[in-house]
């Protein structure tokens, strides 16, 4: 995590330090190279808008996957460590790019008595989109046919449907909705700890979800969740469709 923070040129917060926006990277942005590139895109957009952004010097995992896999004690230990670390610094809001971290910190830490002001980065970027560089707000769609995949933790759990779509549309992209979208969207198959389970090819949820995108002739599947990004990318590779469709983070 410290290495990713240095790579992104992010200021780290020691106890007593202060920032406007505390960026909670999460494990995917810290350790996965592709999500790390999405993190860089977000950080560059925030900087271009003049946002004071910093990370915890001792950020740890939010604990969500431990709880989903039944390790409640481990989850609570991780949560308490994060809560203590967050309580030692000053900030106006927390922003994270992972819906799993977002839901955990916003709702499940509240079960432990800690109520945090947390935003998903799609919400945050939407709130400052008028301050973003014109180039970021007016990309050309080219010949791509773009569809947006709703993450379970953004959509059904937190009703964040419009913000990611507004960001894409403000970038000059025209969206084509899949048959199952918004509240009726299909899971990518990575939630509930299933990211770490091996599933027979004919039973893979991510393959079925990819078929929804292929059915509307999408050439790009956009998403705002690192789990969904990985699961849909795996489906593209396992079904040999890399020459027909790709998956990209909205940043």
What is each model feature region?
Residues 1-251:
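Iron-sulfur cluster-binding electron-transfer modules in prokaryotic oxidoreductases
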């Amino acid at each position: 995590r410290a290495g990713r923070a240095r790579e992104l040129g992010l200021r780290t917060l020691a106890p007593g330090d202060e920032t406007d926006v505390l960026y909670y990277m999460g494990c995917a942005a810290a350790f996965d190279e592709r999500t790390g590139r999405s993190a860089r895109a977000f950080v560059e957009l925030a900087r271009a808008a003049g946002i004071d952004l910093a990370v915890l010097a001792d950020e740890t995992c939010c604990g969500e996957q431990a709880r989903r896999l039944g390790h409640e004690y481990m989850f609570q230990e991780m949560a308490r460590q994060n809560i203590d670390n967050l309580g030692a610094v000053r900030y106006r809001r927390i922003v994270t790019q992972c819906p799993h971290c977002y839901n955990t910190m916003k709702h499940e830490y509240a079960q432990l008595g800690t109520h945090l002001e947390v935003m998903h980065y799609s919400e945050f970027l939407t709130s400052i989109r008028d301050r973003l560089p014109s180039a970021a707000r007016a990309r050309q769609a080219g010949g791509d046919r773009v569809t947006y995949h709703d993450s379970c933790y953004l959509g059904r759990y937190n009703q964040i449907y419009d913000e990611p779509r507004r960001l894409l549309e403000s970038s000059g992209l025209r969206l084509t909705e899949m048959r199952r979208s918004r509240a009726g969207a299909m899971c990518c198959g990575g939630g509930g700890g299933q990211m770490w389970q091996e599933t027979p090819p004919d039973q893979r949820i991510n393959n079925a979800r990819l078929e929804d995108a292929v059915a509307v002739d999408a050439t790009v599947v956009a998403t705002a969740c690192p789990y969904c990004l990985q699961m849909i990318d795996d489906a593209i590779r396992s079904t040999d469709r890399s020459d027909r469709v790709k998956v990209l983070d909205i940043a």
